Each structure stands twice: as C-alpha cells, then as structure tokens.
Amino acid sequence: MSFSYEFPDRQELQKRPSTIWRYREALPIESDRHIVSFQEGYSPLVLDRVDGLDLWWKLEYVAPTGSVKDRGTSVLISRIKEMGIERIVEDSSGNAGASVAAYCARAQVSARIFVPQRASPNKKQQIKIYGAELVEVSGDREETAKAAQCAAKNTYYANQIWNPYFIEGTKTCSFEIVEQLGWEAPDYVMAPMGVGTIILSLGVGFRELRDQGIINHLPHIVGVQAQNCCPFYDAWKSGHKRKAYGSTIAEGIAHTDSPRFEEILAVIRESQGCVIIVSEEEIHKGITALSHRGFFVEPTSAVVLPGLSKLCRHADLAERKIVILLTGSGLKYTRPS
C-alpha cells in the first residue's frame, strides 16, 4: 500500500514509548482508539563478536508472543478492529497464527487459525490457549493456505503476506535498527526467509527511510533458506524454481512458493543482497551454537548463523555494520524425543 507521511522528528521520538507505535505517523491506522497492542517492538539490539566480526543481533524472539510476527499483527488487528470486523480466518506455520490468536483475543475478535498438521505442538497449543479455533490441515504449508482461503470466502482473510497492514507493521523493524544504530543504516541485514514477509517488510521500511532522506543507502538484505526448501534461492540463482521440495526442521520457512514472489525477489536485487541456503546439519549446529551464546531460538531462526558463515566466504564483511534478526523463541519448538 502507499500513503504519504512525514517521519517523526528525532527529538519527538525521544519522548515516545518504546513500541512500534512510536512511529505512529508511519502506520496507517486512522484513530488511536482502535490500536490493539501489547507494547510490542523496540526489541534489543545486542552487540556481539562472531568469528572475528562485530555484529548486532536483533532479538525479535522476545516479543509478546515470542516472534517477530507481533509487529505486523498489531497493525493488522488494529485495522480489523477499525473496520468493525468480528471474525477472521488466518493460515500459518505457527508463529503468525499464535500472534493473530493473541491479538484477536485482546481485540475480542473471533479467530479461526489453519496450520499444517505437522506444525510444532508448542505452537498449536499456544494458538488454542488464546481461545482461537485451531484447524489442522494434513498437507504442506501451501495446502494449508488453500484450505484457509476456501474457509474465508464469507469472512475476513487475515493472512500475513497478502495483507498490506501486516507489512506496514513489520517494516518498523527497519526503523528501529536505524534508530538504535544512531540513525545510520547498517551495511547488511540478514533474516530467515520463508514466504518472504520479513524480507519484503525490511525492504519497504529501509526504502521509506531513504526516500525521506533519513539514510543515504539501502542495506544489503540477505535472506537465508533451508536447503531442503529453497524456492527463492533457486529463482535468485538460476531463474527457476524446482517442481518439488523436501521437508525441513525449520518449519517456519518451509514454503514452496509465495504470492508476492517476484516483489520479494526484487527487494533482494534492489538492495544488492542475496539468498543463502543452509543444510539440516548446519541448522542443528546453528541451534546449539546460538544457545551457547545465550540465544534460545527455534530452528527457523537458527538458519542465520550458518548463513553468516557462508556470506563471509563471498563478501568482505570486515568493518561492516551487520544486523541479524533472531525471529522466533526456542520455547516454540518441540524437540523430537
């Protein structure tokens, strides 16, 4: 979506609460009385040194429901409340579903959440705890989306990648990164990449900051996919997706397609970024290595550490400002017994 706004003054921002709503002018909700919030946003940006590189971890997994999804959900459900909608349907691999269930509970909106049957039990339990109706689909992530779309013919479809309000909320991560770095853009931003919501939102946010003269360059945006399910990598590398993909422990990014595929690839290309793939073994090692640094994240988030190692082989990262998003809590993941 496109709307005009003037980014808030830096001195004014210092007076505002540390949530996504500090950037109120940039969020397309007409009235404050419709805002649905758990004070999400302004997640910690933690300086670390990894393999001789100074970098920052953006701890999105400390959000109210344990994932980056809360940013987009706050704006999406605020808009739903503003429109007077009382029932919604949503599909998810788990994190977005849990987030939507929580914010719908706060807004007193009835939610029906579709997830793959093989989704983590912890995520499914979280959705049910908030009072949403959980519908399990025996199929992959794309089949789950189709089932939700069929069910949403007579109600509101609150899907994260389709809905522009979700993107508008998630773009605030870009704003925070720049503000937390002293109003300077990083050189690289890395995040897990599934359906592409985070990548698209980062692109939107950084582009708005550049267009308003707040930063003078776009960071290189790097998406990390699981080798077993990597349609964006294949398209970025060769121009073609495979006909079929396998399963991955990183369930949150197990998407074989995206409804905004070309738009998301364009974000990577515009930023002169790239897409990286990592193996299942590398993901397991990433979980352990991150936990030994004090970061307890789910497998979907852990792809970024081996992704960083691979990026180092192809780019000179010395003296570069690197920000890496840790997007989902390890508490959401059920380890196989």
Residues of each region from the PLM?
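PLP-dependent amino-acid enzyme catalytic core
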Residues: 1-337
